[in-house]
Amino acid sequence: MRVLASAPAKIILFGEHSVVYGKPAIAAAINLRTYVWAEFNERGAIKIEAKDIRVPGLTVSFSEDEIYFESDYGKAAEVLSYVRQAIELVREEADKNGRGITVSITSQIPVGAGLGSSAAVAVATIGAVSRLLGLELTNEEIGKLGHRVELLVQGASSGIDPTVSAIGGFIHYEKGKFEPLPFMELPIVVGYTGSSGSTKELVAMVRRTREEMPEIIEPILLSMGKVVEKAKEILLSDLEEKIRFERLGKLMNINHGLLDALGVSTKKLSELVYAARTAGALGAKITGAGGGGCMYALAPEKQSEVATAITIAGGTPMITEISKEGLRIEEVIP
């Protein structure tokens, strides 16, 4: 038996950094996906084949007394711990710890870009392996298992990434609580700088600045929280699409300015943001921790022009849209 599952990437639409201080955030799944095939093997080992994960590939086998590294190329290795923990967690849930499982991974999501590649591969792996082992799980349950994987690997996790990847669409998050929001099409372009910042270091930097100048930083964080609530109000409204796009674009630009004030933008991120706006995007901002990684632009009827502008500015564009679906079982071969 073989099972193919897929799970989407995510972007933080609004509220990164301020969410650390109890403010809300809105995230959404996007149509860049990680695909995982799962099947049994006779060796009793966990075997991971990652031949196309937007960095050079690798194949590694784990068993009780041996590890086989056929190749190892930098960031691709980061995938291994998430996949292995996901498989072990599902085998434990299904009470089938001894079964050998091979997973094969392909992905459209660049690793280390702040688009939730680790959560997507964990969620897709859980989806494929749970079906293979006959474990019936809802997408919400799979999202919770994905959160457990992140806690095991990272030691800390809000759960935003695996929840969005499992459920899809828009998610409002505040103080540990998730609320799905109504779906609407958002024609966006993601721009990747080609480098990544350390979320841990950037969060610590903002914290230090807040401790040094609370009277300045607190109002910025408060404003960011209000941006999120205004965006939620727009997503819940029955305004015509054109007006919703325009207002969301304005909020994106405001949110980017506030993030820049916190010091988490970079020259390259700003170049991509302003190139997108000049090319006709209604709004453009950092998504994620900053310091590198990605920005995104809202570009109805201008996606090609914005993508070209991002390329000229030295970024890697990805034309995409919001994914209504989260985890999908794509194929089951008996």
Swiss-Prot record:
Record localization: Cytoplasm
Signal sequence residues: none
Keywords, sorted A to Z: ATP-binding, Cytoplasm, Isoprene biosynthesis, Kinase, Lipid biosynthesis, Lipid metabolism, Magnesium, Nucleotide-binding, Transferase
Cofactor: Mg(2+)
One biological process term in Gene Ontology: isopentenyl diphosphate biosynthetic process, mevalonate pathway
Domain of life: Archaea
EC number: 2.7.1.36
Pathway involvement of the protein, from the record: Isoprenoid biosynthesis; isopentenyl diphosphate biosynthesis via mevalonate pathway; isopentenyl diphosphate from (R)-mevalonate: step 1/3
Family membership noted in the UniProt record: Belongs to the GHMP kinase family. Mevalonate kinase subfamily.
Oligomer and partners: Homodimer.
Job of this protein: Catalyzes the phosphorylation of (R)-mevalonate (MVA) to (R)-mevalonate 5-phosphate (MVAP). Functions in the mevalonate (MVA) pathway leading to isopentenyl diphosphate (IPP), a key precursor for the biosynthesis of isoprenoid compounds such as archaeal membrane lipids.
UniProt name for this protein: Mevalonate kinase
Lineage summary: Archaea, Methanobacteriati, Methanobacteriota, Thermococci, Thermococcales
